[in-house]
């Protein structure tokens, strides 16, 4: 039985003490940022030799205790608040501060410490961007998922893992997960096989190779929103090019919720229902547009991999009497495995985050939510319903699914990758 969002009770075993929970309802983000920035600058001061290790950690621990005191008993709130007002200055300081310090003070360090110091100084800009735009949003999304209906307009109550329990009982979440699964299964292998076939054809002694390569790559550099808008007209039931080409006037590609397996087997008297019916015709239309859009990128990458294979291998295979298919099965596919593994990994990760083409082609998620994906459902919960806590829970589950599947496919497929030519 689904759990209503309005009937949720906070579980005491999952929540902090009452006094801390009451304070966390108005817990400002700049307190978290302030503690983190103080920790970073304290560690840098310790690495530069300005502070001993115990002093740097002591200052950070003291500030943390001070912030908790202000959180629980209301005192000294001006200290973290003042630090929070300086938050806009933290990104440029974090980016330029270490580099400037390295130029000014780096040569004063001992010779052995200079190499490590300059290494950290050069790595820090990229590391700072990674922490600010990747690591921190991920951690903050998990933090938001522990509250009840965060919308940044009113205080939110701490809910522990309640959002995740509701998520597991949400039929729309499972519908979105199933649709996303179909999208991954159809688009990733199909796109990779088509791209490999086209790349092999272009790798032969064909005239105007540069022109063909440009033509295949043009869809990828076209804005995805614009491309999806064009395809929406291609799928139009009355004026669409596809219906004219197939002589199927009136077929509404983007509003047909019937599964393609059910449509194909219905003339044979076989009726399929539910998940066995397959993805809807509308979702297959979305997937076809996606394969077309990303095909050029995969073709260019695969063509570069094919051109790196020595021609002597094919010449030796011809002398041994190998056929066209034997050459590509025994030479091309094994030596192209690093490239295909790379594209398969990127395709798997990207397919689980599909949003733009689904939103443009089917803005409502389909007639029966048959084109609803995880990213689309996350968007609806966060920006349409203003429930950022539940949207954050969806984001964290999506992140875990992508992480697990990526690790599994890496473990299964990397053993078959041949990095030696």
Identify the function of each model-found stretch:
Residues 1-4, 320:
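Intrinsic disorder/low-complexity segments
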Residues 3-144, 178, 182, 193-229, ...:
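N-terminal signal-anchor/first transmembrane alpha helix
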